[in-house]
Amino acid sequence: MGQKIHPVGFRLGITKEHLSRWYADPKQYPALVQEDYKIRQHIDANLNNAGISKVLIERKADQVDLEIHTARPGVVVGRGGSGIEALRTGLQDVLGDQRQIRINVVEVNRVDADAALIAEYIVQQLERRVSFRRVVRQAVQRAQRAEVQGIKIQVSGRLNGAEIARTEWVREGRVPLHTLRADIDYSYKTAQTIYGILGIKVWIFKGEIIPGQEETSAANAAPLPRRKSRRQQFEDRSEQ
């Protein structure tokens, strides 16, 4: 079951928290959930080059609090805070009212240990028609330098323009999806290529979270084993 279920949803309430944290009358839930979706869509569309990792949403009466985790806070804030003001104005237009919107920007410290940012990097490279083998190898190397305990990357679709779609994946280190106390960071994104859509999934194992103790630091854990001149486990069928 751990291989099929969403790694974050599987651990909600154990080691993961909801990205939307608010309470409302049951009759208002559908409208507020749709608002959250529109907010995330607007942020992704207008800040697609800012390296957005995640967006946390909280609600207090007539106030909406947003916490944007990004690898490039300067792009989000803008010169003199102009980016924040433009984003706030756009969100008020999306919501259709003048509710107060507070935006807090948080910088992601370990960019190469964030599944969403690694998946976004792979998407950008694939859309530039770079070979998926090279992209996956570079992404794994970046994660190794960030000293994560394990990473798994899966790419699906018409890889390198092959006639028949297939799925290829590579894993380095440990990625224990069945262990609930394991801190698994997961992301899924799609790349629009001239041959069609490619699906990218990234799992990153950062350590174990034990109740009553702090999270096992990836820096103190043993880094991923480096293997000498081992070829990636890919099968080339692009010319068949």
Swiss-Prot record:
Listed PROSITE patterns: KH_TYPE_2, RIBOSOMAL_S3
Annotated segments matching region Disordered: 216-240
GO cellular component, one term: cytosolic small ribosomal subunit
GO MF, one annotated term: mRNA binding
Disulfide bond annotation, renumbered to this chain: none
Family: Belongs to the universal ribosomal protein uS3 family.
Protein name: Small ribosomal subunit protein uS3
Organism of this sequence: Picosynechococcus sp. (strain ATCC 27264 / PCC 7002 / PR-6)
